Amino acid sequence: MSRRSLSLQFPLLLLLLLLPPPPVLLTDAGVPSPVNPCCYYPCQNQGVCVRFGLDHYQCDCTRTGYSGPNCTIPEIWTWLRSSLRPSPSFTHFLLTHGYWIWEFVNATFIREVLMRLVITVRSNLIPSPPTYNTAHDYISWESFSNVSYYTRILPSVPKDCPTPMGTKGKKQLPDIHLLAQRLLLRREFIPGPQGTNVLFAFFAQHFTHQFFKTSGKMGPGFTKALGHGVDLGHIYGDSLERQYHLRLFKDGKLKYQVLDGEVYPPSVEQASVLMRYPPGVPPEKQMAVGQEVFGLLPGLMLFSTIWLREHNRVCDLLKEEHPTWDDEQLFQTTRLILIGETIKIIIEEYVQHLSGYFLQLKFDPELLFRAQFQYRNRIALEFNHLYHWHPLMPDSFQVGSQEYSYEQFLFNTSMLVDYGVEALVDAFSRQRAGRIGGGRNFDYHVLHVAEDVIKESREMRLQSFNEYRKRFGLKPYTSFQEFTGEKEMAAELEELYGDIDALEFYPGLMLEKCQPNSLFGESMIEMGAPFSLKGLLGNPICSPEYWKPSTFGGDVGFNIVNTASLKKLVCLNTKTCPYVSFRVPDYPGDDGSVFVRPSTEL
């Protein structure tokens, strides 16, 4: 470059440096930035909101049965179905009244027709394959393939919304501890109106711990990427390594120990697996089972003991039928039989009790063989939150003449052996459990669980309770008084949330007015039933390829599944048969009459 060109450029550079900087165009402080239109939840009837630009959106109404800008114009067949379909409250009334009519229905083919209808209508409310997860509020391959996530029924509230619930309610959600103290904490024990007992509460807790496996390391939106359904991982362990530590490797059986002439789970000295016990509990006092936290409550270890005995009992029956089978085949086939027993008991006794229906529910996978049905399941975050039913827990635990406080009951490592299975089953079957819905029935020892669920739901940005009601085909509530059915709690909710459309998902489920003679409100039934039935009937053993006698070792194993009951589960594995039922005795509908006979196995 020449000296002349440099001399010409220098003044130009100097001039540029001395000039004032160009003006910066600032946004007018008086003009608010556009609100994400999807924060208003404009798309109805399961339409999908897609944002375009800053303040435009489009509703994808594909296969919703509706059209129009917001998916609100019904197609002719949709209109006809909606016009003819009875409301959930009317359907519930029909199913819980007219006992003698239902006695006739249960004895005819109509029962199977109605059962098929119940399963298909409920299951169709759950998307399959899964759609959303915590990280993806849109359809993605990750949402489908990555089983480390809980799936989501509704996407999260967009991050850029004016309020935590979208556009409704206050800028800040109420203090969690204040909310729990005012509306969830028990003033006095409110028993369940159906005669529900503490045995039911422990059965529910034991059962659900096989598929609610939140990852403590990854966070509340993640599972341990293991089973997403009824796999009995809480009995056999959720990894092959844990399973191998629990197995005897002889005749298909699980390890056990004999104490006072009775069979119990092995100690951690005999089965080297991690169990969560307080410091200072010696290894010989720690029982080793599939779920590491079951040492917390004697009721959970009670059912672990019963299922251990049942597994080894079934192994003996299969060994007699198939003397040539090796340990592995005996173990694997027995596991399938116990999965079948579990599903049968859950549908025909557990769900039956929860529903309060006079229609007798039936576990028959063949009902779906001609229907379009996917035999796979993914656990949803909403299902996990919904199932925190800690109001079932009483103020204390009554065993015989002794009353145990929570401090005496938790991590009580001697109670199960001291009393024995029969005495604990009998005691828990006779003690009333609490009402779940309606508010103010959490014992203060378990109130922190509710607070943790609400905290997690805020981290995961769950949509409002009313948005979930709409998703499951229910009409949204228009006021807190309509929601609670009374004035005092409604006024407190108005003060805390400011708008019924800002009420959170879990508080909504716990505070909703209960249906007549029911443990909880309409929403819990209408949201919980689809998750449950899809998860149970979506199990592989219910598929046409699996549901046949050969899968279960022939007619003997198949018959065990098809005739399973709570009473048989207990009484075939105890020396005498205690009172066993999900209802306290002398309550209408109780079927737990005692019959005493020796066990043939112990």
UniProtKB/Swiss-Prot annotation:
Cofactor note: Binds 1 heme b (iron(II)-protoporphyrin IX) group per subunit.
Enzyme class: oxidoreductase
Annotated positions for site Aspirin-acetylated serine: S532
Superkingdom of origin: Eukaryota
Catalysed conversion reaction: (5Z,8Z,11Z,14Z)-eicosatetraenoate + AH2 + 2 O2 = prostaglandin H2 + A + H2O; (5Z,8Z,11Z,14Z)-eicosatetraenoate + 2 O2 = prostaglandin G2; prostaglandin G2 + AH2 = prostaglandin H2 + A + H2O; (9Z,12Z)-octadecadienoate + AH2 + O2 = (9R)-hydroxy-(10E,12Z)-octadecadienoate + A + H2O
Documented activity regulation: The cyclooxygenase activity is inhibited by nonsteroidal anti-inflammatory drugs (NSAIDs) including ibuprofen, flurbiprofen, ketoprofen, naproxen, flurbiprofen, anirolac, fenclofenac and diclofenac.
Catalytic activity, EC: 1.14.99.1
UniProt cofactor(s): heme b
Active site residues of this protein: H209, Y387
GO molecular function, one term: peroxidase activity
Residues making up the signal peptide according to the UniProt record: 1-26
GO terms under cellular component: cytoplasm; endoplasmic reticulum membrane; neuron projection; nuclear envelope; photoreceptor outer segment
Record: residues binding heme b: H390
Record-level GO BP terms: cyclooxygenase pathway; learning; maintenance of blood-brain barrier; memory; negative regulation of epinephrine secretion; negative regulation of norepinephrine secretion; positive regulation of smooth muscle contraction; positive regulation of vasoconstriction
Membrane topology value: Peripheral membrane protein
Domain (EGF-like) ranges: 34-72
Disulfide feature: C38-C49, C39-C161, C43-C59, C61-C71, C571-C577
Keywords linked to the UniProt accession: Dioxygenase, Disulfide bond, EGF-like domain, Endoplasmic reticulum, Fatty acid biosynthesis, Fatty acid metabolism, Glycoprotein, Heme, Iron, Lipid biosynthesis, Lipid metabolism, Membrane, Metal-binding, Microsome, Oxidoreductase, Peroxidase, Prostaglandin biosynthesis, Prostaglandin metabolism, Signal
Remaining remarks: The conversion of arachidonate to prostaglandin H2 is a 2 step reaction: a cyclooxygenase (COX) reaction which converts arachidonate to prostaglandin G2 (PGG2) and a peroxidase reaction in which PGG2 is reduced to prostaglandin H2 (PGH2). The cyclooxygenase reaction occurs in a hydrophobic channel in the core of the enzyme. The peroxidase reaction occurs at a heme-containing active site located near the protein surface. The nonsteroidal anti-inflammatory drugs (NSAIDs) binding site corresponds to the cyclooxygenase active site. Conversion of arachidonate to prostaglandin H2 is mediated by 2 different isozymes: the constitutive PTGS1 and the inducible PTGS2. PTGS1 is expressed constitutively and generally produces prostanoids acutely in response to hormonal stimuli to fine-tune physiological processes requiring instantaneous, continuous regulation (e.g. hemostasis). PTGS2 is inducible and typically produces prostanoids that mediate responses to physiological stresses such as infection and inflammation.
Family assignment from sequence similarity: Belongs to the prostaglandin G/H synthase family.
Protein name: Prostaglandin G/H synthase 1
Taxonomic source organism: Rattus norvegicus (Rat)
